[in-house]
């Protein structure tokens, strides 16, 4: 099922899904793995675009590393910094259509047996975007 998500939401969902590690039905584990693959690919694309913005606008030292001051990347001037931050924010707010493998609620209900781990309420909240018909 195609879903439209902001890049920032994709990053958050990726981190949250990576934190789920239970003994669940095969179909649920497969959907988690498949969706992680899709979400990670989008994160990599966004990271590459962020890198491109920083490479164009940030100050680098003689080794090609970004210069930091007070834990922040240094820019040549305030105008360039604002431009870079705006572009980075635009990337983060981009809406991207991703193909999400959904599972029926009945698959999650299978976890209510001794055979599988029962997802916590936090894990259920993370999995919510994957629940379909």
Task: Report the location of each language-model feature.
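A composition-driven surface/loop motif
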Residues: 1-133
């Amino acid at each position: 099922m195609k879903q439209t998500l902001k890049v920032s939401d994709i990053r958050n969902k990726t981190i949250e899904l990576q934190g789920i590690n239970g003994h669940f039905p095969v179909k649920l584990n497969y959907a988690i793995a498949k969706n992680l693959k899709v979400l990670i690919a989008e994160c990599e694309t966004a990271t590459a675009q962020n890198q491109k913005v920083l490479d164009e606008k940030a100050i680098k030292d003689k080794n090609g590393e970004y210069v930091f001051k007070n834990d922040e990347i240094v820019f040549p001037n305030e105008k360039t910094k604002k431009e870079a931050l705006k572009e980075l924010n635009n990337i983060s707010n981009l809406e991207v259509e991703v193909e999400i493998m959904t599972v029926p609620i009945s698959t999650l209900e299978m976890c209510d047996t001794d055979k599988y781990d029962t997802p916590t309420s936090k894990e259920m909240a993370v999995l919510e975007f994957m629940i379909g018909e």
